[in-house]
């Protein structure tokens, strides 16, 4: 919120603020405070809640819909029992309904998929009609068990909030170990056919949903135990020298000819025309050493 206020004061021409909450890793922003600051400067708040479609049904206090955002976008297919490509826009401010409708007329197809729309309605009705106490209990027990693993660390809400976050979505399962993220991802696939959502330089991300039962959590925990046994305590894994580091060093101080990013998730590290700094080169070197896929170089 402090960053938003500083930007709004420095740039009075700003019309809207776009915030991603929760993040890929499940970090929740204080949308209520951000909205208060932005609205005081007559700035709209648009929240990318793509990974939080389940929040209104499980943790409504974490959903931007209930925190003062003007527009909230959710990808139902990410965390609800809905088909890929299904998403919704929540227009929470009455005076924006008409402008959003006009924009949709321009950008949306005039022949929408009724199969998708029926599936979306079914998914929302499923969430509204069910109680998820059993799921939450299973998830809590699973997370408590994971905390006992000596070699694999799972991100906990307390640590995330202590680092300054407003909240944490505990359905997001984020693990790190003494090996790079891609190596842990491959290990989970090899030991138990577990398909991770993504791997970062030092972590992997898995998504739990309300359709996961106790048996699913038990199977995942068994796989984590096998991976934990395979990891040695001696594995400090000194930083490897980045393959092609000399070529990367030559990029320092030059202009990027194309966007440079790691995929997934696809967020730009450097955009076209921006200066590639020495710090950026160091970061790219670390990503490459970890085995991540860098695009644009």
Identify the role of each PLM range.
Residues 1-155:
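Conserved PLP-enzyme active-site core in the AAT-like
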Residues 293-297:
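Charge-dense polyanion-binding interfaces
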Residues 147, 151, 155-265, 271-279, ...:
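Conserved C-terminal alpha-helix-loop-beta "cap" of PLP-dependent enzymes
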């Amino acid at each position: 919120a402090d960053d938003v206020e500083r930007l709004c004061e420095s740039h009075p021409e700003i019309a809207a603020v776009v915030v991603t909450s929760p993040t890929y890793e499940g970090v929740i922003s204080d949308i209520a405070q951000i909205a208060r600051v932005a609205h005081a400067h007559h700035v709209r708040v648009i929240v990318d809640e793509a990974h939080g479609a389940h929040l209104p049904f499980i943790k409504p206090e974490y959903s931007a819909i209930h925190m003062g955002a003007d527009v909230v976008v959710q990808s139902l297919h990410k965390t609800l029992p809905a088909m890929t490509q299904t998403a919704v826009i929540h227009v929470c401010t009455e005076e924006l309904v008409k402008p959003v409708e006009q924009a949709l007329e321009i950008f949306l197809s005039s022949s929408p998929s009724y199969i998708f729309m029926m599936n979306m309605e079914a998914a929302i009705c499923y969430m509204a009609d069910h109680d998820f106490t059993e799921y939450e209990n299973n998830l809590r027990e699973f997370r408590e068990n994971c905390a006992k693993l000596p070699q694999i660390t799972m991100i906990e809400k307390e640590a995330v909030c202590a680092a300054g976050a407003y909240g944490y979505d505990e359905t997001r399962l984020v693990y790190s170990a003494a090996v790079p993220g891609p190596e842990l991802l491959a290990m989970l696939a090899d030991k138990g056919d577990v398909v991770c959502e993504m791997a970062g330089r030092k972590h992997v991300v898995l998504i739990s949903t309300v359709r996961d039962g106790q048996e699913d959590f038990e199977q995942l925990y068994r796989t984590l135990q096998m991976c934990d046994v395979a990891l040695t305590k001696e594995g400090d894994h000194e930083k490897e020298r980045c393959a092609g580091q000399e070529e990367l060093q030559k990029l320092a101080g030059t202009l990027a000819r194309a966007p440079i990013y790691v995929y997934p998730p696809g967020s730009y590290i450097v955009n076209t025309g921006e200066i590639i700094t020495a710090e950026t080169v160091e970061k790219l070197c670390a990503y490459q050493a970890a085995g991540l896929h860098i695009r644009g170089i």
